[in-house]
Amino acid sequence: MFKFVMICAVLGLAVANPPVPHSLGRSEDVHADVLSQSDDVRADGFDSSLHTSNGIEQAASGDAHGNIHGNFGWISPEGEHVEVKYVANENGYQPSGAWIPTPPPIPEAIARAVAWLESHPPAPEHPRHH
């Protein structure tokens, strides 16, 4: 009787566990076609762009100094167009867009404290001679 109960319990768990999808993306993403693509590499920089049938877009331009600016976007699972613009240069990668999270504003009391500290630098320390 114990074996019968255990077999029923294992079968019950197996049936109750929903199957895990193999891909978290949309099924049409697998079959997306490239609608347009261009790459122009020159001695003084490059230009690149890509557009696919499922709404993925990318464009970038770079110069001889290593500065790059561009954008990329896609259609979210909710059907909204997501776009990110960016600059990459000596100051690093700097993305911008409505979808980029932003930090909360600095509380006024903290801003006042920082301003006070900046306007009152500490006195230089003098080494003690023993």
Swiss-Prot record:
InterPro entries named in the record: CHIT_BIND_RR_consensus, Cuticle_Struct_Prot, Insect_cuticle
Specify the domain of life of the species encoding this protein.
Answer: Eukaryota
What's a Gene Ontology MF term here? structural constituent of chitin-based larval cuticle
The gene is Lcp1
Cellular component terms (Gene Ontology): chitin-based extracellular matrix
What GO biological process term is on the record, naming one?
chitin-based cuticle development
Protein's recorded name: Larval cuticle protein 1
Tell me the function of this protein: Component of the larval cuticle.
Identify the keywords attached in UniProt to this record, alphabetized.
Cuticle, Signal
Secretion signal: which residues? Answer: 1-16
- Which residues are in the Chitin-binding type R&R domain? 43-104
